[in-house]
Amino acid sequence: MRGILAGLVLMAGLVSGPAPALAQAPDLIFKKSTVFRFLTPDDKLATYAIDDPEIEGVACHYTIPEKGGISGGLGLAEEVSDISLACRQVGPIKFKSKMEQGDVMFRQSRSILFKRMQIVRGCDAKRNVLVYLVYSDKLIDGSPKNSTSSVPINPWGQSEIPKCGEWIK
């Protein structure tokens, strides 16, 4: 039994690929109960904030449903794929390194096995806009549910406006 479990854990690590370079864990902004559950945790909507670790001056807020009940309280529930996303410029934009279109900005597990939420980023070079996409996927199949947010790169104080197209690999 231990061998099977160890194999599954190893396979999950290989399938998920290398972890993105994350500067920090997301900050919980607030939670709001949506379904009351007697004697067990309620179902909730949780709103988090995260700064883009590779592009200074951009922050994203996302809201995810969190299941309550016994399985949710034990961390065993598979969460649904309904995730909303809003990203904004919060300071002068500074690119730390070159990026590829669709690079993972943030990844989080959404179930005990094989389901994860990902925020990926790209650049619309023609419009000089950063584009962020959140979606969830599983080992075998993903969900078509997604949310997109655009961040036009605007002047901030006296700083020069960088062109995101110059930072694509």
For every predicted segment, state its role.
Residues 57-125:
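Mature extracytoplasmic domains of secretory-pathway proteins
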Residues 1-8:
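Bacterial N-terminal signal peptides that target proteins for export
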Residues 50-52, 65, 90-92, 137, ...:
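Generic structural motif
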Residues 12-21:
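C-terminal segment of classical bacterial N-terminal signal peptides
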Residues 26, 94-169:
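Low-complexity intrinsically disordered segments
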Residues 10, 43-46, 116-117:
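Short alpha-helical segments and helix-capping/turn motifs at coil-helix boundaries
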Residues 24-84:
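N-terminal secretory signal peptides
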Residues 1, 20, 74-75:
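Composition- and surface-driven signal marking solvent-exposed, interaction-prone regions
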